[in-house]
Every structure is written in C-alpha cells, then in structure tokens.
C-alpha cells in the first residue's frame, strides 16, 4: 500500500452548521487532487451523509456536545476519508436487517426511511467500511482516474509496475 502524501485532520462540534465547513475542505482537497466536478459532488454527498449521521445519532443523549473527527488521506491514486465519532454506536448487521436489503436495481422509493445515507455512501464511493466500537467510524475511499464497469468493479486507467 502506498503511503499518504498528505494527511489532513479536522475536528468539529457535532452540530449541523459545521458539516458545510467539512464539505468545503473536502472540495478543496479533491479539486487540488484533480477529481472531476461530478466526483467532487459525489464525495461531498457521501461525506455529508457520514457527518450528518454522526451529528444526528451519536450524541443524541448528550445534546450534541461531542465532536466529529474527519481525516483525509491524500494518496497519488485515491482519497481516503475517515469520519469518526465517540458517541452511541449501533450494530451494523441489525441496522441493515432493519432497513432491509437494497441493491443498485432498487429505486430510491424502495429504500427504507433512514437507509438512504448508507446506500448513498456505498453507491457514490469505491469502498466503504463501517466500524462499530466506542463510537462509529466510517472509512470511505474514492479512486482517482478510474472508470466503473457495469458490474461495479473499478477499472484503473493507468498501468502499475
């Protein structure tokens, strides 16, 4: 695995008004890396969903007194983003069962209420991992200079040695 050329970390209060600042930072990083406008918009939506989930659910019992940590790993071929909170966690398998199955064949109308965020993250990003421990950590990766084929696999547009 290649080392990150740059590593950027932000911490913000778990309040909705700070999600926009995280989006602006992400937009600047992705633009500097050379992502297309459409990819930048996809990145912003996915990160907004992860941050909004942390704001709405992690610190509900504490009146949003916690913080959201966002880390950006800037690699030559990808951007890795980690959104983490130390608030209330949940069982990901139980949540997926509760929300029901979904696939690219489903329409937005077929998604359960509350299931759209994870669906969007998984659809817009190349890799998404959710870790539940003391809080929730969502790790997402978007590759640079790639094309998607119909089966959802990523095809690299450059040769590796």
Swiss-Prot record:
<comment type="similarity">
    <text>Belongs to the anti-sigma-factor family.</text>
</comment>
<dbReference type="GO" id="GO:0004674">
    <property type="term" value="F:protein serine/threonine kinase activity"/>
</dbReference>
<dbReference type="Pfam" id="PF13581">
    <property type="entry name" value="HATPase_c_2"/>
</dbReference>
<keyword id="KW-0418">Kinase</keyword>
<dbReference type="GO" id="GO:0106310">
    <property type="term" value="F:protein serine kinase activity"/>
</dbReference>
<keyword id="KW-0067">ATP-binding</keyword>
<keyword id="KW-0547">Nucleotide-binding</keyword>
<keyword id="KW-0723">Serine/threonine-protein kinase</keyword>
<dbReference type="GO" id="GO:0005524">
    <property type="term" value="F:ATP binding"/>
</dbReference>
<dbReference type="InterPro" id="IPR050267">
    <property type="entry name" value="Anti-sigma-factor_SerPK"/>
</dbReference>
<dbReference type="GO" id="GO:0016989">
    <property type="term" value="F:sigma factor antagonist activity"/>
</dbReference>
<comment type="function">
    <text>Negative regulator of sigma-B activity. Phosphorylates and inactivates its specific antagonist protein, RsbV. Upon phosphorylation of RsbV, RsbW is released and binds to sigma-B, thereby blocking its ability to form an RNA polymerase holoenzyme (E-sigma-B).</text>
</comment>
<dbReference type="InterPro" id="IPR010193">
    <property type="entry name" value="RsbW"/>
</dbReference>
<dbReference type="InterPro" id="IPR036890">
    <property type="entry name" value="HATPase_C_sf"/>
</dbReference>
<keyword id="KW-0808">Transferase</keyword>
<protein>
    <recommendedName>
        <fullName>Serine-protein kinase RsbW</fullName>
        <ecNumber>2.7.11.1</ecNumber>
    </recommendedName>
</protein>
């Amino acid at each position: 695995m290649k080392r990150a050329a740059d590593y950027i970390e932000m911490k913000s209060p778990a309040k909705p008004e700070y999600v926009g600042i995280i989006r602006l930072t992400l937009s600047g990083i992705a633009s500097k890396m050379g992502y297309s406008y459409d990819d930048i918009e996809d990145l912003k939506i996915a990160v907004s969903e992860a941050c909004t989930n942390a704001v709405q659910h992690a610190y509900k019992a504490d009146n949003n007194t916690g913080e959201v940590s966002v880390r950006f790993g800037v690699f030559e071929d990808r951007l890795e983003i980690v959104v983490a909170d130390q608030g209330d966690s949940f069982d990901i398998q139980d949540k997926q069962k509760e929300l029901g199955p979904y696939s690219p064949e489903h329409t937005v109308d077929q998604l359960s209420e509350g299931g759209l965020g994870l669906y969007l993250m998984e659809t817009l990003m190349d890799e998404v991992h959710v870790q539940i421990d003391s809080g929730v950590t969502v790790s997402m990766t978007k590759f640079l200079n790639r094309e998607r084929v119909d089966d959802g696999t990523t095809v690299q547009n450059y040769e590796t040695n």
